[in-house]
Amino acid sequence: MKNNIAELIALVETKHNVQSITTSKFNKTFEIYPWIKAKVFHKMVLGKESLASKSTKSRLGQFKSLFYGTWNLFIRKYEVWAFTTSVERIKIEGKYTDKLFDRISTFSKGKFLIIEFQYFKKYPLRKIASQYVSSKAIFLLSEEIYSRIFLRKTQIKNKAIIKEIEAALKCSVNADAIVKKNLAQYKMMKFWLKILPNPKYVFLTVSYNHYGYIRAFKESGIPVVEFQHGVISENHQAYNYIAKLEPIQFPDVISVFGENENNYLNEQSNMPIQFANVIGRSIIDYYYDRAKENETIKSISVALQDGPIGNKTIEFLLAFNRHSEIKYNFKLVPRRTTEASYKKVFRFPDNFKFTKENIYHTISHCDINITAYSTVAIEALSLGKRSYLINIENKAKDVFLSILGDNPFVHFVDEPNELIELLSKHEKNPEKHEVNLSNDVNISANYKQNCISLLKSLENLNPKI
């Protein structure tokens, strides 16, 4: 079986009539292939199914955050509802800032409400930078209740095609649970839009977790804009479409970091959006200005990822450290997995240190960056730092080779000895502005002006249904 995501998508969507996989509810027909596609490929790549909001831990977490700013939903009308997660917050000048939406909100004439999924982290309201914020819990809990009472059974038309796709991918998911989740999203958001003052626009991240919401918003005449949070390419299942599907549950606009993603979405993918738009990355401007000039390589930032890939990254670096004559200072930045969890598995030498600083601060104060296949591989370049990708199970190349393969400051390594040779060769680092300029196609400059142009372009936008 081919293991390239793009090839697998082509295989599935040319062989099967994926548009015919539907469910009927509320006197409407829903194309559910995108719902299944997002989850089955996620499980195939990462090894586990992504239905975090269905776990007992998640339900308890949402209940605890039920009153976190929730009054803000009811007491005023907003220009924008912006759906995000608390993982997007990083500490800047004493305040936890949402790196997707807080800065663009300052360029808008209207009010922004940040609606935050707080499964992973929760920050005190007094310590966040957002002017208006609400927990997403009220929506999630209402969906859970509705699903349990009214969606006990689901009917999927052409379910046999799902089984054929799962067989081809050698991976299966709980299709009924996925369908219930999205139907509950749709039904309850239609309810809340009758109760709450409606926004003029909805901004969100991770559209493939919000299909039910998107359809509800667009049916109510509210345009939806997705903001890029990670890699967008032919090897991301949520953005690579060959099949032509109805636009009703897809965002109208996708705001991206740079020209590579813009060209891919506008010219190659059949994802049924109206257009993509380049704005850049707000967090990059801030930290690039504060990044130290590159020196002889001594310190290395490491962007860890959750799950088995994080452990394999550490195993690789520990092996590298044992064989390297030079003992570099490694600054490890975990994502959600805790430092204590890693230390239960590994014994770290003195030159490996976990840091409490966010990944951008860490990169800007180190000489180079290493990761497996985190988006940080791209961002490090715009911060002026060389990017080294550990090609575990060929995933780094699957994700980044088409995007970064021609960049002279990007290096894929399969074995620890390769990294030793490269660092010896790269002992003299290039100036940070040289590395930054090499990445303009991936993260555009002029973030402020790009945001202002985007907001202006939305003024006459109608949702495509």
Question: Predicted segment positions?
Answer:
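Catalytic-core helical/loop segments in enzymes performing group transfer/polymerization on anionic/lipid-linked
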Residues: 1-465
